[in-house]
């Protein structure tokens, strides 16, 4: 009986999958528009939400994760990005942040400086595209600085400062003075602890961003090197995690050294055991 039930389930699942794949073809053959079968605003389930509409905490900004450490690059053209911006606008997003303008040899715009350092020529100028789409949908775009990759290899932050002092000037001269949607800067170097040289590096990059752009806002995204920060280790927890108290002490020191050139922070991933 159990085997028969399993076979029946598999047959039904296969038929359901085939139906889903065939639906667009059948609709096209009948001359029907797929959009007829998309939920319209009047058919949505807003009235059944546990938190009534507009009473929840609003999310108005999001990252554009085009060049990432561990997420594959999006194989999107401008049409797909335009649709994504439309969706973001509809749900209340008014700020988009490019998480980084490049990582090691992959870059998002044809930077003369970075190409001269051996980076690959991008097929599309993503920075220009994002800025145009941000203007089209009345959003603000934050530019994420370049990540050399050297910090992750050596824990030496001087590489980030050296490369980005050219990137910041180059980007502002190319895009900042051209687009009103250029709204600020994201200092993309992510740290958890008071790493040697961190305060000086963040201050130098933040100050240059503000100086060239007449004071546009800057922000960072720190994380906590907590007990569950185990990505890539094969472990569930770690014993050498920073305590919440030590984390607070170190970040008080960091903030004290950068508060005049860094305006805000967006707390990044990683978790710590609740007490």
Residue ranges and their predicted role:
Residues 1-2, 27-47:
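Basic/polar N-terminal segments that are highly enriched at the extreme N-terminus
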Residues 2, 8-30:
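N-terminal export signals
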Residues 7-8, 45:
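Positively charged, low-complexity intrinsically disordered regions
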Residues 17-18, 34, 72:
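Residues in flexible loops and secondary-structure boundaries
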Residues 41-275:
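Glycan-processing catalytic domains of CAZymes
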Residues 6-7, 210:
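Short, cationic motifs built from Arg/Lys/His that form the positively charged side of catalytic pockets
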